[in-house]
């Protein structure tokens, strides 16, 4: 039910109830309660209607599988941050800013309005201006030639016309909001769909505009050509292109229709580049969508560089390693430093260390012999073993028998020790193999456990915070990252070591991403790179192709301006004053002035009998230089040089249909 029909129904129902209540015999309180109930019901219906029209999006299911959300998305938000240098700087940002230049739009409107107004001047209007001038300041042929007389008026009328046209254009350009065109370019480069809204404005009053005009000629032209000025003023004041806040754009999978909402209210939109659906996945066709894979790779490399910079340049870093190769030597030194008195524990430890260092059978025998010699004084009586000379001869026979016993004892001890040591060595090797097997299993379990815990210990916002945090905070965060220690087996050695600083170099990657960004923009929008004689880039400007691709759709689809001629590319290198001067030189006014000059000169010649020197030739004297002064020639020559230097080609403007897409 529409609002108008509902209101009419409300009025009719109220009137009918009042008539019925007056004619019936019911009590006033009863009639009043019925009246209020009916009115309350109708008001509830109207309120529900308004709520439904304003909050249409809220009635959609939150997880509707039949809808592809185009915007907002994480990818597009990343694109917007890249374009405006939120985190990093790219060369593509400067190219994008050149594309957002609203000065091109202003020059286009100035050129189109000036071209339409100046070419709408009729020869009758020029002749009327001449007659008014003659009546105010007639020609008397006293020390003043007619050529000078007409030349002064022609230059004066030119300055008046250009001044009034300039005032009109400045008045129009003041109503241009630069942000609308900037957002238009941002939407095209990121999403490819431009939402917009129109405000209800009545036809603009030309009174304020006509206050900028001083001549009757331009005053009449503006009134006669209201279809030129009025649409421009109305279009500039009625269109609103929103930013990226509170905008939702989605695509219905069933109907394949795109819808756009702002604050849960449907708004119009213009599809510049239609998104595709490939393998049930929505794919954008914008320049930044084409660059997205390379931008992600480059961003990942930059984060890696930053992390390596923080990790490998930390002020204090100490690397430690075990020194097991000198442990035995230290033990021996400690034993030697102890007191020289015999100790069974010390002797036994020294004996075992000597055995572990022995690599051959002879070494083991020497170790055992030394051990026996060391402990022999404590178990054998030295007085009995070492006799004096007087008793030596008496004990000689006994010594031979004891020596045989000692040799036999040594051999038995050595044999027992060898067997025991061999048994111990075999057992040690078996235990070492078993230990290595269990160590590998434990390492695998630790690795799995640390892998599962890394997700909890790693901060997902670290990638975005590293570039923006202070150095001290970034270092503290990076130091808390999970690391895995690696154990090296005895049979392996370390082949490399990061004792020196390691930071990846991104110079080649930066240069490559800049080239890709420049290539995408230059070829998509056909921008023109201007270089000097040494081949160095001076600027990036619009070309004729760029104007047709961006400016013309903006004028037609958003401003509803269809009758402005596209500005030539060479005019983009001129100022507004030079543009007006160049348009004036190529307009019909110059030819009309020439015609009026010839006609008036013939009449003056008949009146004052002004002829050339040869009486047989009665043609009037004609000085064409008054219509071709030097400044105008300089402007035309400048345009010619620009056209030849840039090798500019002109295109035929496409015919865009009228109407907005809702």
From Swiss-Prot:
Give the UniProt record's GO annotations in the biological process aspect: chromosome organization
- What keywords is this UniProt entry annotated with? Host nucleus, Viral genome packaging, Viral release from host cell, Virion
Q: Does the keyword Nucleotide-binding apply?
A: no
Q: Mind telling me which GO cellular component terms the entry cites?
A: host cell nucleus; virion component
Pfam families reported for this sequence: Herpes_UL6
In the UniProt record, does the keyword Transferase occur? no
The stretch of residues making up the signal peptide is none
Q: Give the highest taxon in the source lineage.
A: Viruses
Q: Where in the cell is it found?
A: Virion; Host nucleus
Family to which the UniProt record says this protein belongs: Belongs to the herpesviridae portal protein family.
Query: Do you know which HAMAP family this protein is assigned to?
Result: HSV_PORTL
- How does this protein assemble? Homododecamerizes. Interacts with terminase subunits TRM1 and TRM3.
Please describe what this protein does.
Forms a portal in the viral capsid through which viral DNA is translocated during DNA packaging. Assembles as a dodecamer at a single fivefold axe of the T=16 icosahedric capsid. Binds to the molecular motor that translocates the viral DNA, termed terminase.
This protein is called what? Portal protein
- Species name: Human herpesvirus 6A (strain Uganda-1102) (HHV-6 variant A)
């Amino acid at each position: 039910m529409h609002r108008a029909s509902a209101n009419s129904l409300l009025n009719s129902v109220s009137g009918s109830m009042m008539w019925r209540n007056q004619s019936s015999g019911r009590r006033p309180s009863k009639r009043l309660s019925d009246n209020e109930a009916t009115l309350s019901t109708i008001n509830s219906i109207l309120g529900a209607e308004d709520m439904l029209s304003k909050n249409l999006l809220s009635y959609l299911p939150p997880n509707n599988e039949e809808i592809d959300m185009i915007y907002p998305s994480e990818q597009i938000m990343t694109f917007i941050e890249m374009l405006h240098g939120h985190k990093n700087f790219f060369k593509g940002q400067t190219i994008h800013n050149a594309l957002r230049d609203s000065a091109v739009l202003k020059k286009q409107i100035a050129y189109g309005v000036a071209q339409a107004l100046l070419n709408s001047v009729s020869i009758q209007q020029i002749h009327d201006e001449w007659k008014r001038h003659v009546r105010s300041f007639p020609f008397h042929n006293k020390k003043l030639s007619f050529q000078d007389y007409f030349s002064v008026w022609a230059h004066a009328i030119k300055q008046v016309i250009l001044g009034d046209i300039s005032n009109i254009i400045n008045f129009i350009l003041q109503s241009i909001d630069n942000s609308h065109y900037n957002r238009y370019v941002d939407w095209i480069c990121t999403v490819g769909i431009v939402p917009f809204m129109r405000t209800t404005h009545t036809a603009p009053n030309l009174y304020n505009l006509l206050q900028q005009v001083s001549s009757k000629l331009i005053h009449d032209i503006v009134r006669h050509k209201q279809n030129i000025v009025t649409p421009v003023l109305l279009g500039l004041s009625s269109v609103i292109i929103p930013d990226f806040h509170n905008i939702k754009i989605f695509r219905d999978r069933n109907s394949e229709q795109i819808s756009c909402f702002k604050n849960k209210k449907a708004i119009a939109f213009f599809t510049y580049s239609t998104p595709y659906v490939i393998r049930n996945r929505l794919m954008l066709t914008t320049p930044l969508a084409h660059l997205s894979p390379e931008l992600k790779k480059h961003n990942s490399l930059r984060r890696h560089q930053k992390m390596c910079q923080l990790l490998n340049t930390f002020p204090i870093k100490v690397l430690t390693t075990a020194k097991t190769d000198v442990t035995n030597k230290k033990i021996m030194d400690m034993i030697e430093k102890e007191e020289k008195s015999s100790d069974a524990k010390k002797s036994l430890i020294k004996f075992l260390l000597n055995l572990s260092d022995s690599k051959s059978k002879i070494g083991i025998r020497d170790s055992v012999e030394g051990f026996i010699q060391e402990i022999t004084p404590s178990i054998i009586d030295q007085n009995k073993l070492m006799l004096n000379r007087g008793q030596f001869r008496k004990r000689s026979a006994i010594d031979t028998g004891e020596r045989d016993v000692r040799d036999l004892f040594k051999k038995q001890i050595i044999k027992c020790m060898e067997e025991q040591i061999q048994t111990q060595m075999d057992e040690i090797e078996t235990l070492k193999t078993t230990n290595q097997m269990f160590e590998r299993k434990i390492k695998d379990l630790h690795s799995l456990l640390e892998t599962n815990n890394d997700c909890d210990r790693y901060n997902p916002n670290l990638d975005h915070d590293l570039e923006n945090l202070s150095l001290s905070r970034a270092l503290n965060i990076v130091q808390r990252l999970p690391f895995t220690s690696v154990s090296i087996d005895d049979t392996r050695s370390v082949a490399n070591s990061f004792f020196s600083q390691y930071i990846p170099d991104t110079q080649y990657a930066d240069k490559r991403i800049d080239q890709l960004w420049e290539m995408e923009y230059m070829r998509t929008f056909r921008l023109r790179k201007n270089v000097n004689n040494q081949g160095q880039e001076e600027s990036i400007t619009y070309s004729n192709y760029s104007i047709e691709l961006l400016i013309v759709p903006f004028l037609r689809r958003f401003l509803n301006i269809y009758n402005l001629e596209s500005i030539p590319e060479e005019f983009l290198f001129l100022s507004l004053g030079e543009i007006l001067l160049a348009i004036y030189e190529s307009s019909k006014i110059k030819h009309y002035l020439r015609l009026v000059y010839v006609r008036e000169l013939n009449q003056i010649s008949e009146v004052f009998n002004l002829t050339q020197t040869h009486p047989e030739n009665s043609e009037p004297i004609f000085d064409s230089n008054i219509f071709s002064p030097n400044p105008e020639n300089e402007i035309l020559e400048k345009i010619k040089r620009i056209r030849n230097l840039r090798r500019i080609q002109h295109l035929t403007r496409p015919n865009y249909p009228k109407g907005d897409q809702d």
